[in-house]
Amino acid sequence: MNDNDNIDKDNIDTMNDNNKLIIGLDEAGRGPVLGPMVIALVKIKGQDLKNFEKLDIKDSKKHSKNRREELFEMIINNYDVRYEILEAKTIDKLMNTINLNKIELMAFTKLINSVLKEEYPNYKENSKIQTATPQIEIYIDACSSNEKAFANQIKSKLIVNDENNIKIIAEHKADENYKIVSAASIIAKVIRDRKIEEYKKIYGEIGSGYPSDKITQKYLANYVEKNRELPEIARKSWNTSKKLLKKIEDKNTVDKIKDSKRIKTNIELKQTKLVEF
């Protein structure tokens, strides 16, 4: 299922800590029709692992909003944090050529490689022959149904290739099983939530942005009815958006037909008056 089936999910191995880097990645906002998807990475040094494991960090969904904010500040102030914000228009553009899993994979590898570039400054661009010195463990919440294939895809795009020292552990629910991934999930969730709050100041109450959210549904329906288009923060490639656009297209077609009939009727009336005259 992963590169190291003997890894204890409750407590990552802390042996040889001084020569180890632990990296966790997760996303927030994969499914919403409104707003961005955020990919986050948290990196800790091996010598900090024991203290990190003692922290009350769980999957972001298991913390209250206030607690997530507290943990967010603690994590970014004590550990290496990186993130990628993919706005709706960026997601739509990428969806023209690749699917959502590949978009997520692309963002994961971009963040991981940003770490590797710093850890191995002498790497050669597009080279796969380097050997890493420290042991690097990368934990990822897998978005693909095939965890092993997902891990291999990530590995194939890394700028450092070392089977002995770089381990990729990609699993479903990794955000529940590994604190380092839980930390990344908190970072991603808080950043997305803050973006949604920014949008509300511009667009009014938009809800959570998820298609199942009644407030989001009402907001989108009203916006499209009024403006005959989707807001900039909407993912136009989502089925929810496509259905709303289809309704507008159908309504525009009906309106054009009505206008055409009205014009035709007016012409006929004018012709009738001329004949009578």
Swiss-Prot record:
It comes from the Archaea. The gene is rnhB. One of its GO terms (cellular component) is ribonuclease H2 complex. This is Ribonuclease HII. The lineage of its organism: Archaea, Methanobacteriati, Methanobacteriota, Methanomada group, Methanococci. Manganese or magnesium. Binds 1 divalent metal ion per monomer in the absence of substrate. May bind a second metal ion after substrate binding. Residues 20-250 form the RNase H type-2 domain. It comes from Methanococcus aeolicus (strain ATCC BAA-1280 / DSM 17508 / OCM 812 / Nankai-3). Belongs to the RNase HII family. CDD domains: RNase_HII_archaea_like.
